[in-house]
Structures are given as C-alpha cells and as structure tokens.
Amino acid sequence: MSLVPATNYIYTPLNQLKGGTIVNVYGVVKFFKPPYLSKGTDYCSVVTIVDQTNVKLTCLLFSGNYEALPIIYKNGDIVRFHRLKIQVYKKETQGITSSGFASLTFEGTLGAPIIPRTSSKYFNFTTEDHKMVEALRVWASTHMSPSWTLLKLCDVQPMQYFDLTCQLLGKAEVDGASFLLKVWDGTRTPFPSWRVLIQDLVLEGDLSHIHRLQNLTIDILVYDNHVHVARSLKVGSFLRIYSLHTKLQSMNSENQTMLSLEFHLHGGTSYGRGIRVLPESNSDVDQLKKDLESANLTANQHSDVICQSEPDDSFPSSGSVSLYEVERCQQLSATILTDHQYLERTPLCAILKQKAPQQYRIRAKLRSYKPRRLFQSVKLHCPKCHLLQEVPHEGDLDIIFQDGATKTPDVKLQNTSLYDSKIWTTKNQKGRKVAVHFVKNNGILPLSNECLLLIEGGTLSEICKLSNKFNSVIPVRSGHEDLELLDLSAPFLIQGTIHHYGCKQCSSLRSIQNLNSLVDKTSWIPSSVAEALGIVPLQYVFVMTFTLDDGTGVLEAYLMDSDKFFQIPASEVLMDDDLQKSVDMIMDMFCPPGIKIDAYPWLECFIKSYNVTNGTDNQICYQIFDTTVAEDVI
C-alpha cells in the first residue's frame, strides 16, 4: 500500500445526506456483518455507522472481491467511504456501493496508531483525515458504549450470544452442513465444554499440541454458509467469531447426569454472525498472544463430556414443548429481535410469577393463534385515544357514498382559486349530478399522476375508478360556505387501493380550503393531508393473540403491529391476494398443521407486561414488540 498525491475530498455529515447523491463519509461502526457470499456471485457486507450528528446510516456494500469490502473487526472501528451512493428505501436513507467505491478502516481505540486497513494498493490519506479519525475517536469514547459482546471463554454463560477472539488449533469436516473448529483463548470455560466425536474424521492440526491444551480448548460447530469460510481457515490463525451461541446440554451417563457447554455458530448472517481472520498486527491479537503465553496449561478442567454432534429429534406424547427437548443445533429462530439482542432470556414460568409492567426476552413456540381467518386480524387503530375498530366493509362504504350522492352539488362552491370544477349528469339514475374538483398547483392543473381530486356525489365504484387514474381522491359534500369531508365513516383520502381513515373522536375537522397549504407539494402525503384537515389518522394494524409455550409455561401475548412484525403493510394486505397468501404461509410455518409442537420452529420475541383494570378485576396482559419475522422465512 502507498499514498497517492493528495486530493481534496469533501465529507458529508450523516444528517445532510440526500437520496440520489454520491458522497464521501466518515463514521463509527455501530453494527456490521462480515462479508458473506450473497445469493448471486458477489460478496455482501452490511455496515451501520454513526457520526457526531448522532444520525445512523446503514450501508449495503457489494463486491465481487471479498478483500475489497471494508475490513472491520469490531463495533467502534472507524470507516471512511468514498463514492457511496445514497438512496431512500422504505422511507429509510441507506448507502450502497457505486462505481469506484473505496473504503479505509481504522481502529477506534483512543491512542491506538492510526493505520488504515485496506486492500487497495493506493489511497489518499491527509493530515485532515488524521484529524477526522482522532475527532471521531474522541466523540465515540464519550457517546458510544464499548461492545460487551466481546467476551473471553472464562466469562461466557449458557444461552448467550457473544463474540470471541481466539486462535485456531485444529479443524475437521463433520458433514456437508457442519464443520468443527478447535480453538482457545488462554482461559477456561466456567462449565465443562463438550467434545464432538471425531473418531472417523480427519483432524487437521498438531494433535500433540491439541492434547496438551485440551483443558483450555473448546469445540465449535459451524453450520451452513459458514462452512466454506471455516474450511479455508489456516491452523494457527487468529480469529474473531461473531454471535457465537452457547447452550448447556444435559447428558446421561451410567449413574449420573452431566452438563456440558456447547458452542455453535448457526447459519445465516443475523446479528452479524460470521468469522473473520485477524492480522498479527491487530491490537486484540497482541493481547491474545499475551494471554496464551501466560495460560496455565496444567490447570485441571472439569471432566470433558463427549457427545454426538447431532442427536435424533424426539417428540413427547403431550401437546406441549418438552422442557428437555434436544434442539437441533442448526435450527434458527423464525423470528428475530430488532433491538436489545443480547438481553438474557426469561422462561415463561418466571414471567407468569412477576408483577407488571416489565419487559422480557423469550424463546418459545406458537401453540395456537387467533383469529384463524387472517384477514379478520386487520383493524384500524387510533394512536391518540387507542380506539380499535373494524375496517369498513365495501357494502357499508357503498351505502355511505350512495347516501352522499343524493345531495346536489352547490354551484356557488365550484371553480375556486384552489380547484377547477367539472359537473357530470348520469344517465338512467334520475339525472344524478357528480362534481369533480381538480386541485391546482400554484394555479396550474397538474398531471393526473400528481393530481388530487375532490369528488361530490360519486358512488364507490366511480370513486375507485378515479383513484386508479389520479394520484389521490377525497370524497366531499357541499357545506354552507365551503366543501366539507363527506363523513369520517368513509375514507378521508383514497390512493389507489389504499383507503385512509380518520378518528371520529379525536379529529376536529377544518375547511377543505386548508389544503391550500399543500398545493405546492408534488405528492399528497396522507399524514400531511390529515394535518391540514384537522384529522387524526387511523393506522392499519394486525391484531392477533399468540399462545406461546417454552416448556416451562404457557402465556398469551397480544400482537398489534402495522408493518414491522410480518414486514408486510397491514394497510395493503386486505387488497392484495399475494400479500394475504404470504401472511398465511408465515403463520402456517410458525404453527404447522398436523404435526406435534416439538417440531414447530422457535420464536425469539420481546414481550412487555402491563396491567388492565376491568371494574374491580385486575389482570396482567402481555404484548409482543421489537420483533420481526426472519428474512429467510419471508
């Protein structure tokens, strides 16, 4: 690597990013996934960064060359991205690679040497860059908590996810879907570590050295997409393994039951799961070498337990999850947590004994759910008064619009500075008059795909046809001095197949002329229209009851979510058969018909407890939050 002649680059703060631009940025790594092979031929890495503006940016980086992606070893590292393309996806700003994308990575520790990590032979690094790295280090030292997921073996506990810095002593192929790594970090686990039977396997490594270190060595099974990475590792190399999972397993011998601590790197890339080789120059490797040199090799560990890596599944005769069920090592959760991933799990039996309010992380299976007819789960929810109501049926809407169509439009309210008006007289319907008012943009009629219509006297079928041709439609009627909303029992805004409703209790309706404040906008955002008209908009939500079972207890939890849990908008599912099928498939996967519950997938969830008072009766209820369906399930 060598420096190139200095070029003056401009770096954009993360709070000033705009979609469609190509920028240069600096940031501190808050989350990352080590490079992994995508479904195509490229490698992919996901990196979330933050800077002094406290704005986060998630970047999806692709390259045909593994080494061309950022060389990140842990959260807190500092990155510099050149020629990063900014786009907006699902209302979230994100960065993606563009032509000529390049990156540098620096250790984020205060006082550490500022040495760029990059696979590029040539790069630009000036005194200004040096100052920016130092400034980010200082800021991060007071604004970001150090990652406590990086643990030593002596500190790990069962049912934990953590990152491990270690040295590879040996490796062996187990089968096509799993691979064995023997590693150490100079410390001993607090529980006996398991041993994978390898009598028929070829173990690569110094067997005498491994035997000498057996009291300090652990066996890790890695699965699925991580196998090809594990296979390429060199014995003796220093590794960081991300999101390693520990489980305490009971094994029955002749006269006693023994416990052993298992280590698994599950398939997939959730929570940054993966393996990275660390260079000898890395400061964490320096510390690891010191730990290895001072390790007490003669210390006696608890008796190691030898166990098979893949016991057969067994199903209990009862319809509840077996407390001692042997979970298959590769089995991943069908749901994932969107925050607080490293909180300890709590068994349901303990939750049921505690007072509310509390928050818990659980792992359970779905025994049953309501309603079984999933389209019935979509409701309308007011975020202000928390009222829940049914989504109006088409037949009810048709009656509301037919009733509105009996009133004749007032000629005095037509053709104003806000809109141009056109009147149609229907045939064979007693000369029913329909008024359509085309809202202008600064006095000019916009194109149909940008145009808002106000319609008087239209039927449901007529309004639906217009909503497919124009940007938005608002059903109105003639008032004494101005046009008014038809009725909050009907949608206040229709966009394509989406009907937007308002809360009758919380809304204080304003004149249609208040839309003047929005006429210079190029799109009609439902929340902006609602605000202009004094409407508190209702949200489409899925409302369901899940009966959860973890083998220690059974608990009913309430799900109320607009789009995060299923990653499918509740506002669209009623009008889209394909989306309805997707939700049906997800629920059939959670709760498969015709098989016993032990074969159901695990669900990883956050739930919160709260008190509900009904007269003199007090009840504790539970609600699911910060949980979403895993990407590989959708």
UniProtKB/Swiss-Prot annotation:
Keywords attached to this entry: Chromosome, Disease variant, DNA-binding, Nucleus, Telomere
Residue ranges that the Swiss-Prot or TrEMBL entry lists as coiled coil: none
Protein name according to UniProt: Protection of telomeres protein 1
Subunit structure of this chain's protein: Homodimer or homooligomer. Component of the shelterin complex (telosome) composed of TERF1, TERF2, TINF2, TERF2IP, ACD and POT1. Binds single-stranded telomeric DNA as a monomer. Associated component of the telomerase holoenzyme complex. Found in a complex with TERF1, TINF2 and TNKS1. Interacts with TNKS1. Forms heterodimers with ACD. Identified in a complex with ACD and single-stranded telomeric DNA.
Localization in the cell: Nucleus; Chromosome, Telomere
Chief localisation class: nucleus
Role according to the record: Component of the telomerase ribonucleoprotein (RNP) complex that is essential for the replication of chromosome termini. Is a component of the double-stranded telomeric DNA-binding TRF1 complex which is involved in the regulation of telomere length by cis-inhibition of telomerase. Also acts as a single-stranded telomeric DNA-binding protein and thus may act as a downstream effector of the TRF1 complex and may transduce information about telomere maintenance and/or length to the telomere terminus.
Annotated organism of origin: Homo sapiens (Human)
Magnesium listed as a keyword: no
